[in-house]
Structure formats: structure tokens, C-alpha cells
């Protein structure tokens, strides 16, 4: 038996906590025997004193074990259980292609996703732009879809990592969100509750990233890889670029449209293709579905070319109560904004920089995201035909096409786009889509 205040005192004085002490505290968070004040105190001591790798692993596994941990053994699946997690960005629609692509190659992807947070778009919000799409199937239905289709994308239920939900709510109001061991534990508690064989992390870098600097993004990626592997799940991470909108669109319905066009081959943004393929390659190799990069890429290209990935996406949509002919007739089902027109720069030049965070917030301001949890989303608004870094901008090439609910909203968004995109008289050096791969 432990005392919460003695655990807090031990960490306050700079000592490492044991696995038993951490589990006692996390179980107390779950069953409400630990007060909010005690949670806040421990969070602040961790913020200032950090955690050792064994402490980080214990924290993550204790939060994972505070609720249901999915077990797929009874289904006798003939492939690995694999998933991807992104730290979030703007125009980051990779999940919608990646899940079906990996499933078409023989993996099983039980993806538990989130809603938009701040300037970043949420996968669940995007999918809810599809009429009827059910993001909360019951547990049995979720398992059936994974078994039959190979991929399902759903929301987090209250039974998964409940201690994390309470811990995070306290961190959010006590200035302890940006602690790498606490971020790592929060991300991985939910992901490891999926019962995975392998995981790939997409950690964003740049003006639209969650972490403010390259060094902090790198530190987070290394922490997640270390903790997840320590918890027994094969994990790699990619540091990917978020100095510009990843896709050619940003919003909800507009990104779903681009995802379908990507899968069918109608249109593939080159940077989106690079990042999606790189993440899929990691999943295939970690899941033992391919022996190396070349074999993985060949398999992934094949399921794009032969239509199998698009077919899997269509089957997932139908299985989750969306239209059965969605892939073939997506424009019939996706909402369209009242006003769609291009915005042009006031001067000419090359795009040298982009405030990606500001562009994400512009989508939120138009109604495409939430300022608070109770807000309703306008799924139709957003940007398409986004210009990219290095593009030559003149009176012919717009910065973007803005899809808005009315003229006033369009004008506000146009102002935000112009302010967020910087022009120069010479083109900038090109930046990679993927900066680094982290394996340990």
C-alpha cells in the first residue's frame, strides 16, 4: 500500500518511481481515489524532473492497462495488427489512404483516431463528412469489420485508457501538457490498447507541427520509439515535414475527396504520396509483410494500380454505414460550400514560407474545426488547390481556392491566406518530405 503524497514527494525530490508506485497512482486516477490536486502535483514534478526510460514504460503501460486492451487472438487473423499515429498537421489526410493500402497488402489496421485539436484537422471529423459514417460501432462490430475488411477507423471509447483521459484533462489546465514523458504516455496508452504487433509514428516538423522546434519533435519521436519498443510493440518513427499544407486541400469534405482521388489514381499530390508511402513501408516491414523498402513499395504501388486499395476503402465506408457506392460517386455525397472562388496574392514572386498553423486556424475560423468541444462543424468549408513552397505566383496562379459559407467568411479566409503565405523574388531551396527515420 502506498500513499499518493509520498509518491509525489519522492518524485519532487528527484528520485525515480518504481513500477508499483506508478501503477498505484494511475489506478487511483482511474478509480477517483487520487484527487485532481494530487494529479496536478505529480504532473508538475514530472514536468520539472523528467522520467527515466523504465518510468516512462511503466507510466505508459499502467495507463494502457487502466481500461480495455484489445485482443485479436480469438479471430485467428492471418496477418499482423498494425497502425500509425500522427502528431497532427494541416492537410494530413494520410490515414484515409494508409489504412486501406496496408489492409490491401495483408495487414489489419484497427485505427482509433481523434477529432481536430487546435489548428490540426481530425480524422474522425473528416470521416463524418461522409453521410451516415459511424465512428462508434460497438466492440463486436469493430472486430467484425477488422476481420472482414482489414481496416476500420473509429473514435476512442470510454473503456480505452480511461486514466489518460482524466490525467490529460488536469494537465490541460495546469500548464503541464508539453512534457515529453507525459505526451509519450498519453499517445501510447491509447495506441497500445489497440493490441498492436507494430506501430509507426508520424512526428511532424515545422510551422504546422505540434512541437515548436525540430529538436523537440526529434526528442518526442525518440521517446515514443523507446517507450513503445520497451512495452513490446515494434515501433519506428518518421520525422515528416509540416512547413506547408501536406495535401492540396485542407478541411473535411475537401480532404476526403482528395483521399478518394489519391486511391483511385485520379490525382496524387507528390508530397502527400511521399509521406503516405513512407509510412506504409514502415508498417509493412515492421509487420513482416515485406522484407525491405523495395518489396514494400512494389506491393503498395500494386494495390494502388489494381484498384484493391480503393476497393478496401469503399468496403470500410459501407461497413461503417456510409454509402455503398461512395468511391464511385463521392461528389454526390460530400457536402459542397455555398461559395468557392480563388484567392490571389497582391504581389508576384516565389512562395518562400508558409505559416501552416495560421492556415489551419483559418479553416477553424470558417467553421471547419472546433474552438470548443460543443461547436458544430461545417464539413463543406476549407481550401483546395493549395499552392506549395517554391511555386511561382502571379496573376494566373492562385494561392488557393477558398470554399466558404458566404462572402464575409470568404473575405476573412482570404485575408488569413495572404498573411500566412510569404513571397520572395527567388525560389527557396527544396525541403524533404521525410527528414529522418528513427528505429531505437
From Swiss-Prot:
Keyword Transferase among record annotations: yes
Enzyme class: transferase
Reaction equations catalysed: thymidine + phosphate = 2-deoxy-alpha-D-ribose 1-phosphate + thymine
InterPro entries: Glycosyl_Trfase_fam3 (IPR000312), Glycosyl_Trfase_fam3_N_dom (IPR017459), Glycosyl_Trfase_fam3_N_dom_sf (IPR036320), Nuc_phospho_transferase (IPR035902), PYNP-like_C_sf (IPR036566), PYNP_C (IPR013102), Pyrmidine_PPas_bac/euk (IPR018090), Pyrmidine_PPase_CS (IPR017872)
Domain of life according to the entry: Bacteria
BP term (GO), one: thymidine metabolic process
Presence of the UniProt keyword Transferase in the record: yes
Keywords associated with the record: Glycosyltransferase, Transferase
NCBIfam families: PRK05820.1, T_phosphoryl, Y_phosphoryl
Subunit structure: Homodimer.
Sequence similarity: Belongs to the thymidine/pyrimidine-nucleoside phosphorylase family.
PANTHER family (alphabetical): THYMIDINE PHOSPHORYLASE (PTHR10515:SF0)
Protein name: Thymidine phosphorylase
Name of encoding gene: deoA
Amino acid at each position: 500500500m502506498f500513499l499518493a503524497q509520498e509518491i509525489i514527494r519522492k518524485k519532487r525530490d528527484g528520485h525515480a518511481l518504481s513500477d508499483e508506485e506508478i501503477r498505484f497512482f494511475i489506478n487511483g486516477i482511474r478509480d477517483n481515489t487520487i484527487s485532481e490536486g494530487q494529479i496536478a502535483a505529480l504532473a508538475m514534478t514530472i514536468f520539472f524532473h523528467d522520467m527515466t526510460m523504465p518510468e516512462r514504460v511503466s507510466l505508459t503501460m499502467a495507463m494502457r492497462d487502466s481500461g480495455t486492451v484489445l485482443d485479436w487472438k480469438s479471430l485467428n487473423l492471418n496477418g499482423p495488427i498494425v497502425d500509425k499515429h500522427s502528431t497532427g498537421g494541416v492537410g494530413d489526410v494520410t490515414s484515409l489512404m494508409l489504412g486501406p493500402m496496408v489492409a490491401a497488402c495483408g495487414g489489419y489496421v484497427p485505427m482509433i483516431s481523434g477529432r481536430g485539436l487546435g489548428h490540426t484537422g481530425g480524422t474522425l471529423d473528416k470521416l463524418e463528412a461522409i453521410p451516415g459514417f459511424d465512428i462508434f460501432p460497438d466492440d463486436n462490430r469493430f472486430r467484425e469489420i477488422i476481420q472482414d475488411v482489414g481496416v476500420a477507423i473509429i473514435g476512442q471509447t470510454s473503456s480505452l485508457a480511461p486514466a489518460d483521459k482524466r490525467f490529460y484533462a488536469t494537465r490541460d489546465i495546469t500548464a503541464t501538457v508539453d512534457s515529453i514523458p507525459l505526451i509519450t504516455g498519453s499517445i501510447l496508452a491509447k495506441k497500445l490498447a489497440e493490441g498492436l504487433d507494430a506501430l509507426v509514428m508520424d512526428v511532424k516538423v515545422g510551422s504546422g507541427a505540434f512541437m515548436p522546434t525540430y529538436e523537440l519533435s526529434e526528442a518526442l519521436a525518440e521517446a515514443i520509439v523507446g517507450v513503445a519498443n520497451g512495452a513490446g510493440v515494434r515501433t519506428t518513427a518518421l520525422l515528416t515535414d509540416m512547413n506547408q499544407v501536406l495535401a492540396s486541400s485542407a478541411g473535411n469534405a475537401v480532404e476526403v475527396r482528395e483521399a478518394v482521388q489519391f486511391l483511385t489514381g485520379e490525382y496524387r499530390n507528390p508530397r502527400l504520396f511521399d509521406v503516405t508511402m513512407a509510412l506504409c513501408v514502415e508498417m509493412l516491414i515492421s509487420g513482416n509483410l515485406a522484407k525491405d523498402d523495395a518489396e514494400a513499395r512494389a506491393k503498395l504501388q500494386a494495390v494502388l494500380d489494381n484498384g484493391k486499395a480503393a476497393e478496401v476503402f469503399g468496403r470500410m465506408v459501407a461497413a461503417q454505414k456510409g454509402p455503398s457506392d461512395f468511391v464511385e460517386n463521392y461528389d454526390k455525397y460530400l457536402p459542397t460550400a455555398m461559395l468557392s472562388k480563388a484567392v490571389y496574392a497582391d504581389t508576384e514572386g516565389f512562395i518562400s514560407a508558409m505559416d501552416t498553423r495560421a492556415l489551419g486556424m483559418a479553416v477553424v475560423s470558417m467553421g471547419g474545426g472546433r474552438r470548443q468541444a460543443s461547436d458544430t462543424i461545417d464539413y463543406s468549408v476549407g481550401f483546395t488547390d493549395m499552392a506549395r513552397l517554391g511555386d511561382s505566383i502571379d496573376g494566373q496562379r492562385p494561392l488557393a481556392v477558398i470554399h466558404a459559407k458566404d462572402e464575409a467568411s470568404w473575405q476573412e479566409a482570404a485575408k488569413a491566406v495572404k498573411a500566412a503565405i510569404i513571397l520572395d523574388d527567388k525560389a527557396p531551396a527544396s525541403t524533404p518530405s521525410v527528414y529522418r527515420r528513427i528505429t531505437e
